[in-house]
Amino acid sequence: MEITALQAWRAIPQTRDIVDYFRGIFDVIGVTIEETGEELTIALEAEQIRIDAGLPENPDFVVPLKWENVENMVSHAEDGQIDSHESWRIVSVLFTSLTQATLYNPIMASDIGRRISRVEDLAHVYLIAPDGHEATCHTLAYLKKQWLVIPGLYGKPKRTFRMTAEDSIEYQRRVFSAIKNNSFREWWRFSRWYKKWRKTVSVKH
């Protein structure tokens, strides 16, 4: 009998390094597997990552995966640790889904939110591999009071971001914290941090 994604991922060692790697990136996500039609819930708990069949009722976001992504995750985590190259491989899979989930938040999509953070309405974003090559990329476009996250590069950007996996994870943890707490103070703190962080990972045109 062929192994399922649920069985494969439940066999991954639940080390502190593995659990802490994902802490702050999400609380609960849904995962769909293209080839098998499986739907899974991935929930971060105090000491472990819980993996159940079926999609959660209120996921932070849903990630569509292929079977090769399932096998790669097993390979990345089989030694109980995630190195920089493995981190890049993981983030490159989550990259667009993470961006969509955070930018679709009402605060991030509002004109006020954009003005507070001084976010341009058209940007190109590159995820840089450990060897320095530009790998995954997408376009962020603000149109009719909503963000569009489009795989690939389109239009003439007003800003270009070039981020490592570590940069992307730091951003996700900061913005996810602001979304969870959802207070003026948290969003103000995020805005101040973002404007400083942006200078280290982007160029304005």
Task: Tell me what each language-model feature is.
Residues 1-205:
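Feature captures hydrophobic
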